């Protein structure tokens, strides 16, 4: 409860609905203006910006304002200057959403890779379909690998490339018969 209270105090210190509504609107306008569509067809613009909005709904921030989060090993962990993310539907997002993030939100893409590597350190493998600190194993494959490689090849982030390679190789060598789906 103390973590929730700290989050509330940090994120919503004032009891001012209009203030937060305006701040959220301004933030969404900043996010959606990262890509400019030039078209005389308003329906095309609405479709594009709706899809862009949908691309930003997940992954979700999983760490508290102080950097604490509950890991897949069922322990409390602490970030150090980065944000931990969860809700990785990598089967669905590695082809388009994550490459998009490398252009529109490189800092966030870096933190996502760091989240993968933290998951690996705490769970012994990269995430497949991480949902709020737990692996669901809802899909097959190693879709965190192309996300990591894409960020690395684009020069994004300050994650440890040796640790990333170790995580990719270790995950690829897991005996899948040990995973209970």
Give the location of each predicted region:
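Second-shell loop/turn segments in exported
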Residues: 12-13, 35-40, 84-86, 97-102, ...
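Active-site-surrounding "flap" and adjacent substrate/cofactor-binding loops of secreted or lumenal enzymes
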Residues: 18, 66-80, 106-131
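Conserved oxyanion/phosphate-binding beta-strand-loop segments in alpha/beta enzyme cores
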Residues: 38-84
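Extended acidic/polar, glycine-enriched regions
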Residues: 1-39
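Alpha-helical support elements that line or immediately flank enzyme active sites
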Residues: 48-63, 86-109, 149-154
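Structural helix-adjacent loops and short alpha-helical linkers that scaffold large soluble proteins
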Residues: 39-44, 61-67, 103-113, 153-166
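Secondary-structure capping and boundary motifs in well-ordered enzyme cores
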Residues: 43-44, 83-92, 137-144
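Conserved small/polar residues in nucleotide/adenosyl-binding loops
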Residues: 179-181
């Amino acid at each position: 409860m103390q973590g929730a209270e700290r989050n509330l105090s940090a994120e919503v210190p004032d009891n001012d609905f209009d203030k937060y509504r305006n701040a959220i609107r301004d933030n969404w306008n900043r996010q959606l203006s990262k890509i400019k569509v030039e078209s005389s067809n308003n329906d095309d613009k609405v479709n594009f910006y709706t899809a862009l909005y949908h691309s930003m709904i997940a992954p979700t921030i999983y760490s508290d304002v102080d950097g604490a989060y509950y890991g897949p090993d069922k322990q409390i962990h602490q970030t150090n200057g980065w944000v931990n993310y969860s809700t990785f539907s990598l089967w669905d997002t590695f082809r388009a959403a994550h490459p998009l993030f490398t252009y529109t939100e490189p800092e966030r893409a870096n933190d996502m890779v760091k989240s993968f590597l933290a998951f690996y350190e705490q769970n012994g493998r990269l995430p497949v379909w991480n949902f709020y600190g737990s692996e669901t194993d809802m899909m097959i494959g190693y879709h965190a690998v192309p996300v990591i490689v894409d960020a690395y090849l684009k020069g994004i982030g300050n994650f440890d490339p040796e640790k990333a390679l170790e995580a990719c190789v270790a995950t690829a060598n897991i005996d899948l018969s040990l995973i209970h789906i």
